[in-house]
């Protein structure tokens, strides 16, 4: 058995590594059956905390639509589906073909979009795709700071920084939890960014931009 307790990683922050090692030591001594039982109990505890005892204001982790949950739990989500509709490498995916075409049609209508890319594995990769489509490394962008609930993929530590973008903050009125439109106009004229991102991980009210 690999002893993860001794497998220290120098690239991980010390306080994070300490937290992991503290709990890993406890799990290391458990049997497979005990680990399985613990996994289910942790899921139950999470659902109780987040679904019953909390009000979640982050839409990305809020209660999922029951219809969407049913679709996600279907076995079609476990199948490899490589290639475009009508030209799949994997057999038995003719229904997935139709679902993908249906989804493209739905998204075009919903967002009035000419093109739809639905195959991204996460929001972080989707944001990276957006950067690649609208900017190039070295370009300037403006985005919400961490204090204004800006997403990590809009920052130097995330996709924007890893892609090589120069990041500037969108002026924000913290008392109103809103964008400062006048200050943004002044800053944008000075910075001249290729892209301005008006989006936060927490949005209590519509942003004041007309």
PLM regions: where:
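Conserved N-terminal alpha-helix of the aminotransferase class I/II PLP-enzyme fold
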Residues: 80-125
